[in-house]
Amino acid sequence: MTIAFQLALFALIATSSILLISVPIVFASSDGWSSNKNVVFSGTSLWIGLVFLVAILNSLIS
């Protein structure tokens, strides 16, 4: 169970880092938002899902 928690936490940190870099770039580009809207929403949905997964796994471990 600890390995699953560590992997989920690593995925959350990696997704956060990717979104931290990519979202401002998408908003700064001229046609970036209209062409990359689905990618941003998918990344945000993945991030929210990982937050809940890490919370559930944390409650099971401790």
Curated annotation (Swiss-Prot):
GO biological process, any: photosystem II stabilization
Source taxon at top rank: Eukaryota
Transmembrane segment boundaries: 8-28, 41-61
Major location (coarse): plastid
Quaternary state and interactors: PSII is composed of 1 copy each of membrane proteins PsbA, PsbB, PsbC, PsbD, PsbE, PsbF, PsbH, PsbI, PsbJ, PsbK, PsbL, PsbM, PsbT, PsbY, PsbZ, Psb30/Ycf12, at least 3 peripheral proteins of the oxygen-evolving complex and a large number of cofactors. It forms dimeric complexes.
Function field: May control the interaction of photosystem II (PSII) cores with the light-harvesting antenna, regulates electron flow through the 2 photosystem reaction centers. PSII is a light-driven water plastoquinone oxidoreductase, using light energy to abstract electrons from H(2)O, generating a proton gradient subsequently used for ATP formation.
Name of the protein: Photosystem II reaction center protein Z
The organism of origin for this protein: Drimys granadensis
Gene coding for it: psbZ
